[in-house]
Design a protein with these regions (language model features):
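Anion-binding and metal-coordination hotspots
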Residues: 207, 212
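Single conserved hydrophobic/aromatic residue that forms the stacking wall/gate
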Residues: 213-222
């Protein structure tokens, strides 16, 4: 669900390796329709929404999600994504999503404490995303002072999820392949990566060309 990573181009590559892609919440139904017509496998993607609907009944992210799921009911997964899920309305929002979509897999987050993991699973989430601040472009810890070291959060939250028949997804902090192995060893049932895939041509980001001159170059010496 990260800009430059949660794209259809990335999804088409990852689906060849049995990997899921969470498509960004700003993607329109028309863009979904075009991607499906060009070979996107619905079983390999998740639709995504934020929580703007709590305050705005006509929130675009949620209405887009509804339209996409109506067009493509074979999509199995819904991801409800916010940087910090510690606000009083989040659990109630997950309840509402579960009531509206009883047969979908709901991924909710992000949190870092076992108590919140249990609360979300009990109230409708199948998978809880774990991680506040470890992502390569995340500033939540520095801006708000909220966060837990990622491996510690995974270990504690995995134990809580297992106790209520749920799952966790480690989200953030993976810089090297070994970090994925550590997350799985810590108890994560799945791992979300973003920064490791950022910058590839499939991400659709803006291409910037830079000319670098080394110190021995005549231009640099002039």
């Amino acid at each position: 669900n990260m800009d430059g990573v949660g794209t259809f181009e990335v999804a088409k590559v990852l689906q060849q390796h049995k990997m899921m892609t969470v498509i960004t919440k700003t993607t329109t139904p028309d863009e979904w329709k075009e991607a499906v017509g060009n070979g996107l496998r619905l079983q390999s993607v998740s639709v995504c929404t934020g929580t703007n609907k709590i305050w705005d009944s006509e929130a675009l992210d949620y209405s887009n999600m509804q339209k996409v799921l109506e067009m493509f009911p074979d999509i199995k997964m819904i991801t409800v994504d916010v940087a910090n899920a510690y606000h009083e309305n989040f659990v109630d929002f997950i309840k509402q999503v579960r009531d509206e979509y009883p047969n979908k897999v709901i991924v909710a987050g992000n949190v870092v404490t076992p108590e919140m993991v249990e609360e979300l699973i009990i109230n409708g989430a199948d998978v809880v995303k774990i991680g506040i601040g470890p992502g390569s472009v995340c500033t939540t810890r520095t801006m708000t002072g909220i966060g837990v070291p990622q491996f510690s959060a995974i270990v504690e939250c995995a134990d809580a999820a297992n106790g209520v028949d749920g799952h966790i997804m480690a989200d953030g902090g993976c810089v090297h392949p070994g970090d994925i192995a550590k997350a799985l060893a810590g108890g994560a049932h799945m791992v979300m990566i973003g920064g490791m895939l950022a910058g590839h041509k499939e991400g659709g980001g803006e291409l910037i060309t830079c000319l670098l001159y080394t110190s021995p170059s005549p231009r640099d010496k002039s």
